[in-house]
């Protein structure tokens, strides 16, 4: 009953916030606006797909600005590290994607503005919107947080954007996009999959603070790795580094697996990476897009 009441309150606040603060804005005058979103509260693969989009567009000679929310500081840090050698891709953090998009539009320094999330910001009109679907688009109150894992309903997005929406299914056998584990390595570049079968570690633990930790666990188990314990922190946890260091010190004979996003928090706010012990492994993901879908996306962005 409490969760139902919370869902009703959440829905009322959502509609009030959009009616007052997020009324439809003006389209950009010069640059192409792209929004990557999902109905899910987290864990849909938005940042990995943004990474793939930016790589694909920059390979075509396009200049790309990626806009992240300030709250997702770890995702911005991960993207900056990933694109450090590509000056044509710049990462920005902001609390107001709409305002920053228009500021960048006036500079004409980029060809594309790519919003990592922003699906719920109804001011971002005229965008090409890619929606990552892991289930059918939600239509009922019971699918909203905290009863479900949806932030909004399909009808909330039916009329406020004048651009084009492309829905991409991610969770069925016919999916044309896959998010797969590329490697699980420590600082010596040793892959855990090659050593976990031995008596090298007493335990193998998942330690993460991401949107969908259960999907990560399933992906790791599919690699043949038996997980001993699962420690899930909140997404974007700013105390992640301290909590992980404590766990590592208390369990030196155990292996710990974190994600790339978790690793982006390991500087503890100092800007300098902390020492990584040999028993700390980073699970790195890659995005595989079907050739037909990739061609469709490029055609949508470059020729329309």
Please give the residue ranges for each predicted region.
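Charged, amphipathic alpha-helical linker segments immediately N-terminal to NTP-binding catalytic cores
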Residues: 1-11
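Walker A (P-loop) phosphate-binding motif
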Residues: 18-72, 176, 186, 197
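Short helix-loop-beta junction
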Residues: 60, 81-86, 220-228
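Short, high-confidence coil segments that cap the C-terminus of an alpha-helix
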Residues: 61-63, 109-110, 126, 201, ...
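Phosphate/Mg2+-binding loops and adjacent switch elements
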Residues: 71-177, 183-187
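C-terminal accessory "lid"/substrate-recognition subdomains
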Residues: 139-253
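Short, flexible loop segments at boundaries between secondary-structure elements
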Residues: 233-237, 276-304
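Acidic beta-strand-to-loop metal/phosphate-binding motif
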Residues: 254-261
């Amino acid at each position: 009953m409490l969760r139902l009441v919370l869902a009703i309150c959440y829905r009322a606040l959502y509609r009030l916030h959009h009616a007052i603060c997020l009324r439809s804005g003006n389209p950009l005058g010069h640059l192409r606006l792209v929004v990557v979103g999902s109905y899910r509260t987290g864990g849909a693969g938005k940042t990995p797909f943004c990474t793939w989009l930016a790589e694909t567009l920059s390979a075509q000679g396009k200049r790309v600005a990626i806009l992240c929310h300030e709250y997702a500081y770890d995702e911005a840090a991960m993207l900056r590290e990933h694109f450090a050698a590509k000056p044509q891709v710049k990462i920005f953090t902001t609390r107001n994607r709409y305002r920053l998009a228009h500021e960048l539009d006036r500079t004409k320094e980029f060809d594309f503005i790519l919003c990592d999330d922003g699906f719920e910001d109804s001011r971002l009109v005229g965008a090409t919107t890619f929606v990552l679907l892991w289930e059918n688009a939600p239509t009922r109150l019971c699918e909203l947080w905290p009863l479900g894992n949806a932030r909004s309903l399909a009808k909330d997005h039916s009329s406020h954007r004048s651009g084009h929406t492309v829905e991409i299914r991610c969770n069925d056998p016919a999916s044309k996009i896959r998010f797969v584990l590329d490697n699980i390595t420590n600082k010596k570049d040793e892959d855990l999959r090659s050593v976990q079968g031995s008596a090298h570690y007493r335990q193998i633990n998942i330690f993460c603070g991401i949107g969908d930790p259960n999907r990560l666990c399933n992906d790791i188990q599919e690699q043949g790795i038996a997980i001993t314990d699962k420690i899930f922190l909140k997404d974007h946890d700013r105390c992640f580094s301290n909590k992980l260091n404590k766990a590592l010190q208390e369990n030196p004979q155990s292996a710990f697996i974190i994600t790339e996003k978790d690793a982006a928090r390991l500087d503890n706010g100092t800007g300098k990476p902390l020492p990584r012990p040999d028993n700390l492994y980073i699970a790195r993901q890659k995005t595989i897009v079907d050739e037909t879908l990739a061609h469709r996306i490029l055609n949508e962005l470059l020729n329309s």
